[in-house]
Curated annotation (Swiss-Prot):
Name of the protein in question: Probable transcriptional regulatory protein Rsph17025_0577
Keyword DNA-binding in annotation: yes
GO BP annotations, alphabetical order: regulation of DNA-templated transcription
HAMAP family for this protein: Transcrip_reg_TACO1
Record-linked NCBIfam families: PRK00110.1, PRK12378.1, YebC/PmpR family DNA-binding transcriptional regulator
Record carries keyword RNA-binding: no
Family classification: Belongs to the TACO1 family.
Keywords: Cytoplasm, DNA-binding, Transcription, Transcription regulation
Organism: Cereibacter sphaeroides (strain ATCC 17025 / ATH 2.4.3)
InterPro entries: Integrase-like_N (IPR017856), TACO1_YebC-like_2nd/3rd_dom (IPR048300), TACO1_YebC_N (IPR049083), Transcrip_reg_TACO1-like (IPR002876), Transcrip_reg_TACO1-like_dom3 (IPR026564), YebC-like (IPR029072)
A GO MF label: DNA binding
Amino acid sequence: MAGHSKWANIQHRKGKQDKLRSKMFSKLAKEITVAAKMGDPDPDKNPRLRLAVKAAKAVSMPKDVIERAIKKSQGGDAEDYSEIRYEGYGPNGIAIIVETMTDNVNRTASNVRSYFTKFGGNLGTTGSVSFMFDRVGEITYKPAAGDADTVMMAAIEAGADDVESDEDGHWIYCGDTSLNEVSEALEKVLGESEEAKLVWKPQNRTNVDLETAQKLMKLIDALEEDDDVQTVTANFDIPEDVAARLDA
């Protein structure tokens, strides 16, 4: 399987997540509300809600905002959201998966299509690119959790399938249906993880040049800034020297 994306680390260091923090809060709150509405409002009894709350805490979402999102799910006025996945190709044939949560499917489909068209890509049909990705659980630990061997042994014992470690941390991968089980087993050995979530993991990544990277970032930024879009995943990586020139 393809290694953890260096681009994701570079993106994080450049502060892109801070720029999108307010958007991120609203997207996470929506996921919490939907998860609580679909299951039990108690995170201990609702695996999806537990993961959503964990993701919110990972970006320091205030406790009262989390509780308000859960409470909203129990009200009669809670919106009905549809979860729709869009797939397509960005510049240079880079495969992109866009996960959305929307109360207006027509609006979202039109917006997503327009972003792909505007920034040199084209929207495909469901299944047109997802075969190039694996749906897996991803559990993230900071470097302080231990050295690579320690984390690898803990992951194997917990039932994980793969581990990737570098100076930025550890990424542990498992089957999509065993994420909660593996995450809980790891917590007993390594402590609480930084993040645990379901992801689309590219089977291979393509390194891109500066021009392609610039086009891709414009497309991904447009998608991520849309209130209906929850996640954007693509099978490319930006080498560090290209990333440095992106911000120059």
